[in-house]
Structures are given as C-alpha cells and as structure tokens.
Amino acid sequence: MSWQAYVDEHLMCDIEGTGQHLTSAAILGLDGTVWAQSAKFPQFKPEEMKGIIKEFDEAGTLAPTGMFIAGAKYMVLQGEPGAVIRGKKGAGGICIKKTGQAMIMGIYDEPVAPGQCNMVVERLGDYLLEQGM
C-alpha cells in the first residue's frame, strides 16, 4: 500500500461512521520530509518541524512556546513522551504519533472531537509500529 493510500484510506476516512473527517493529515519521515499528505495539509516551515522533532527527543521543549504548524500556534497538551504529541488551537487541534520511521499527523476542527483524532492517528501509528515501520 502506498503512503498516499494510508493517508486517504486510514487518516482521512469517515470516523466511526459519523460522516466526520479530519481537516487534514500527513505522513512524514523523521527528518520532516513529507511522504504523503491530504489536499488541505498546511505547508509548514522547516524550523517548525525541527521543533516537533526536538519535542519527541526532549519532551517539554514546546510547552513554554507552543507548537507551530504553518504559522498557526497550537498549545501543547499532555502526550506520551517520545511517542505522541497533542496540541489544541481554538475548537480544533492536532495529534502527532511517532513510529520507528515516520510521524503520523492529523489536524481536526469541530465537530471532530480530540479523542476521535487521537484514535485515528494513533491507531495507524500503532499498526505501522507493529509492521516494523
């Protein structure tokens, strides 16, 4: 299966039969290069990706300043050090799951709930980890 198919079929899917979808999603390499993305995934800056990569290596580095994606600031919430970063911006947010070789990113807005985004992103991330990815 191509990385684009994972984005289209597993991240941008209908969430639990509700007719709701993530706003955008992507799969990136651990160096921040985009492997596949949805049509509306924001164009981030290299320094923003460096901050996210550093947060996975040193949990808590983004909490004081927030996390930025394409200039949009997300307040960093609890996550799982080295594995998951969660952020909130207004009525929406972001979830990023790190695997052995990639980062799975999902961005959502209402009516999608934070837990729904986390479930979609982390489920794919866990699957890829099980596959040695």
Swiss-Prot record:
The keyword Cytoplasm applies. Gene3D superfamilies: Dynein light chain 2a, cytoplasmic (3.30.450.30). Keywords: Actin-binding, Allergen, Cytoplasm, Cytoskeleton. Pfam families: Profilin. Its main location: cytoplasm. GO terms for cellular component: cytoplasm; cytoskeleton. SMART domains: PROF. One of its GO terms (molecular function) is actin binding. Binds to actin and affects the structure of the cytoskeleton. At high concentrations, profilin prevents the polymerization of actin, whereas it enhances it at low concentrations. By binding to PIP2, it inhibits the formation of IP3 and DG. Belongs to the profilin family. This is Profilin. It comes from Helianthus annuus (Common sunflower).
